[in-house]
Amino acid sequence: MLIKKLIVFIEKWGLVLLVLCLLTVFGFTVEEGMKPQADAEAISVWTSILDTLTSDSEKAEGWAKVMHLLFNVTLAWAGVRVYMSTAGFKWDNFAARYLARSHVIIIAGKSEENSPSNTGRQFSNSAGLEVDKSALAIELALSMATSRPVVLNLKSVDESNRTKLWEAGVTLLTEDMAMAAVLAATGAQRASMLIAMRDHYGDNIALTRSAFSHSMDNTELECKCLIEPLSVKRTFRLEDYFENDSLPRIRIFNEAELIARRIMQNHPPDLPVARSNEAGVHLVLVGLGSVGQSILLQLARLGHYRSGKQPKVTVIDRNVKQQWREMLGAYPQLVSLVQVETQELKIEEITEEDVDRWLFDERPVTMAYVCTKDEIANLRFARLLVNRLQARDPKSDLIMPQVVALDPPGGCVLSDYSVNGLHNGCFHVFSLVPSDLQKQETSKNAGNHLISEMDDARARQFHEGYCAKDRVECEQQPGRQPAPFNRPWTELPETARNANRMTADHFEVKMRAVDYCIIPKQALADSLVLLPDQLELLARMEHDRWWADRILDGWTHNAVRDNKRKFHPNLVPYEELTEPIKQLDRDSVLQMIEILDNEGLAIARTC
């Protein structure tokens, strides 16, 4: 670390220091040459400068000799810089392979060594399935390096990013190596976490399997495996590629889904109407690419609120009709869960009249997400919407929605507008890894945000509680068979694990519906309990959420349950459920409060 910092300092300031020293010594040499000699008169400053510039290094004395030395060193600087870069990478190679302990490994970029043509692996539509995540990997490494050691393997890193990474303490490897070689070079045998995010999902699967091989002998290693694009992630089954004993240590992720999950947690669309029995959610969604589709799907799963009304979504994109048809092809049940209105427009074509029409809809806008890949386009629409909001009558009782714009990796315009723009706090910028400007506004560690989104702690506690309750019922009813999903977390299909994750994600929605919030337990004088009518309301919301999650996963109603054919008898309105089944929903709500208590948290009335 010290050697790396020294190399970075010399590389960054070496030339400046050499030039300053050279100019200083040159001045001393000129001054020395102007002094009168015993057998000659004093010379002018210009004559002394000329003599200094044309002096012979072999005959130089005093300051002139020092000047020639510094001049030669400065000329050699280009070669020294090349050497320093080589030495720096060699030191990083040594440090990662032999010295790193309990570190995070991030492997990203495109691998020529492991391309399908070189390995014999063949992927259909290979070019279309490659998604560059280099920028995200660099920003993630910079963010995570503030709290833990990080080793980044990325083949191509420009000079400015390389300097940033070194200054942050990130160990950087740029060689393109075979799977086993890159894991050995990054010290995977002693690492605590591997984040495999190469451009092709096949490489990430191979890296994760190699990391769990017996030769690595690291039973504590956790792996986060990127599966892109979204079309592949939708049908991906973890159990098709990994053995059951490996599943607990693997979490697949997709950047668009992580963004959707986090953006709806940080800026929930129901916030202005959460406690209303009448008002419904109206989301304006600009961009129906991978992020927009993930947000829409997340809303369909979690958008079950106190009012019982379907969320309304106004979707704006230049090719929105075709994109919406493709979504319905993958999820035909969406039409029964969200009310979608499509507006086929380019962002540049949106006018103030369009914005006013959405704002003054019979169901007023409660939130706007702007999530195209073009930050300039995002900025235009965000400012247009903010300006129309500010132009409204301040005495109006209409909802004041928030505007959230997605900031792509490497972006800076939206961050600047968020911090310095005139938006009266109704504009927010979102990124998985905030920019420097955003970090000035928050004390949270950005790198941990992404990792925490892949943490299954609460979901596993939900499942363990479900299994414990089912075991008790089996003991009380001799001959009763355990429920189909009453088995260890490691043996659950990914869809069942996702169902538990959704249960955890929906809890804050439920708390807002009864005007509660989650706070540290020590900040609460007396513990609160849910009133019977509150518990019943939240149980209904939980059932609606579960119902939506099941039908989006392909389940249909049938009087007899069949897991293989995805039949379930409880896919009916809450009022039609039997009392024991309703109690399961109530228990789910109460279990979340127990989980919060275990984490040192409690529910309290919203201030």
Where are these regions (language model features)?
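Short leucine-rich amphipathic alpha-helices used at interfaces
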Residues: 473-475, 480, 517-519, 524, ...
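In a subset of proteins, long, contiguous C-terminal domains/tails are tracked
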Residues: 80-86, 567-607
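Cytosolic regulatory regions of ion transport systems
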Residues: 2-24, 30-69, 73-481, 485-540
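A structural signal for well-ordered alpha-helices, especially hydrophobic packing surfaces
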Residues: 508-511, 550, 593-596
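Amphipathic protein-protein interaction modules
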Residues: 526-579, 584
